Curated annotation (Swiss-Prot):
Gene3D superfamilies: P-loop containing nucleotide triphosphate hydrolases. There is a cross-link at K36 (Glycyl lysine isopeptide (Lys-Gly) (interchain with G-Cter in SUMO2)). The modification N-acetylalanine is found at A2. It catalyses: ATP + H2O = ADP + phosphate + H(+). Keywords: Acetylation, ATP-binding, Cytoplasm, Helicase, Hydrolase, Isopeptide bond, mRNA processing, mRNA splicing, mRNA transport, Nucleotide-binding, Nucleus, Phosphoprotein, RNA-binding, Spliceosome, Transport, Ubl conjugation. This is Spliceosome RNA helicase DDX39B. Residues 261-422 form the Helicase C-terminal domain. The gene is DDX39B. GO terms for biological process: mRNA export from nucleus; mRNA splicing, via spliceosome; spliceosomal complex assembly. A motif (DECD box) lies at residues 196-199. The modification Phosphoserine is found at S38, S41.
Length: 428
């Protein structure tokens, strides 16, 4: 497959666009030490109870983890035994750490052999997952990790596989398939096959075909794990076809949106009143970092520019910019160089920035799933957060009602004053 074809396919995958960009990620990164609050867990047991390698426990301590989240408590003991796992849990509960820790625990690195394959539907998420592997394998110097996705030269990927073959490969299906077809990537030694945000990949037929073709290139005997924040009853049988008697964990079913500590409000206004209201709110609200979601690339660029003109430290991320630029901006925001991010849905799914405590739906998301993934950017890791949605027409109101009905949550009108302690961790 030509490189351009791969890139175009990936663009099709990544943005189910509605005149816009869409689709952003799905991985849950662990909280770092300087973050206020840690995973809220009903389990008092620590990670030591999982009998993990000492090197992994040291890295976990460095990341500031204390107790496993509910999904980690449920999944890790079985996952490290090599069982197939199908897991749905709400955003911000540490699903990524489940498969990262489980695969690193079982990994016995063999020079020149790829043992672990992790696939996800966007480049940004692939990049983030590879960083999680690097973070947790900090004290495992023999473990090599590589990430492959479209938008960057396939020749460089081929070089890496030839000269410095990784044990763990993370990537998007289009690029992984291209590398496997041209024999650069050998999948005959895969022992662990993981799909993150699996519903996004398996619902789209072209992407599902790629995943199936890649799956057939791997050995019959292997561990398969799939994770997502949203897993409809229709897609679950599709997932099971890849697995042998999987352990199924649905930590919270899709009927409830109980994002711990997240305050949700809406504001009714006309489209031309949005900027003034946004500026007013940014002036009065206390925030660490903010993500503002818009529906198109044009609106993303214009709003970010307007914010900068009003002296707000804003940066934009959208699918219209080159891949290197997107990753560079993502890193700038993650490193706290900018405090306000304007983004299309590309950023909406699972991208983890621990300091974000406010998410704005400047434009209403197109459905309730997208709403869940967007607002989950605030209040991750059991910390507090605030989600504010602008409602400017009947269609917006209908989607907001759908969200409330589906997730059995009451989203009320934004009051004149909000108690700061309800959406930001107070320093002691």
């Amino acid at each position: 497959m030509a490189e351009n074809d791969v890139d175009n396919e990936l663009l099709d995958y990544e943005e189910d666009e509605v005149e816009t960009a869409a689709g952003g990620d799905g991985s849950e990164a662990p909280a770092k030490k300087d973050v206020k609050g840690s995973y809220v867990s009903i389990h008092s047991s620590g990670f030591r109870d999982f009998l993990l390698k000492p090197e992994l426990l040291r890295a976990i301590v460095d990341c500031g983890f204390e107790h496993p989240s509910e999904v980690q408590h449920e999944c890790i003991p079985q996952a490290i035994l090599g069982m197939d796992v199908l897991c749905q849990a709400k955003s911000g509960m540490g699903k990524t750490a489940v498969f990262v820790l489980a695969t690193l625990q079982q990994l016995e690195p063999v020079t020149g052999q790829v043992s672990v394959l992790v696939m996800c539907h966007t480049r940004e998420l692939a990049f983030q997952i590879s960083k999680e592997y690097e973070r947790f394998s900090k004290y495992m110097p023999n473990v090599k990790v590589a990430v492959f996705f479209g938008g960057l030269s396939i020749k460089k990927d081929e070089e890496v596989l030839k000269k410095n073959c990784p044990h763990i490969v993370v990537g998007t299906p289009g690029r992984i398939l291209a590398l496997a077809r041209n024999k650069s990537l050998n999948l005959k030694h895969i022992k662990h096959f993981i799909l993150d945000e699996c519903d996004k990949m398996l619902e789209q037929l072209d992407m599902r075909r790629d995943v199936q073709e890649i799956f057939r290139m791997t050995p019959h005997e292997k561990q398969v794990m799939m994770f997502s924040a949203t897993l409809s009853k229709e897609i679950r049988p599709v997932c099971r076809k890849f697995m042998q008697d999987p352990m199924e964990i649905f930590v919270d079913d899709e009927t409830k949106l109980t994002l711990h500590g997240l305050q949700q409000y809406y504001v009714k206004l006309k489209d031309n009143e949005k900027n003034r209201k946004l500026f007013d709110l940014l002036d009065v609200l206390e925030f660490n970092q903010v993500v503002i979601f818009v529906k198109s690339v044009q609106r993303c660029i214009a709003l970010a520019q307007l914010l900068v003109e009003q002296n707000f430290p804003a940066i934009a991320i959208h699918r219209g910019m080159p891949q290197e630029e997107r990753l560079s901006r993502y890193q700038q925001f993650k490193d706290f160089q900018r405090r306000i991010l304007v983004a299309t849905n590309l950023f909406g799914r699972g991208m983890d920035i621990e300091r974000v405590n406010i998410a704005f739906n400047y434009d209403m998301p197109e459905d309730s799933d997208t709403y869940l993934h967007r607002v989950a950017r605030a209040g991750r890791f059991g910390t507090k957060g605030l989600a504010i949605t602008f409602v400017s027409d009947e269609n917006d109101a209908k989607i907001l009602n759908d969200v409330q009905d589906r997730f059995e949550v009451n989203i009320s009108e934004l009051p004149d004053e909000i108690d700061i302690s309800s959406y930001i961790e107070q320093t002691r």
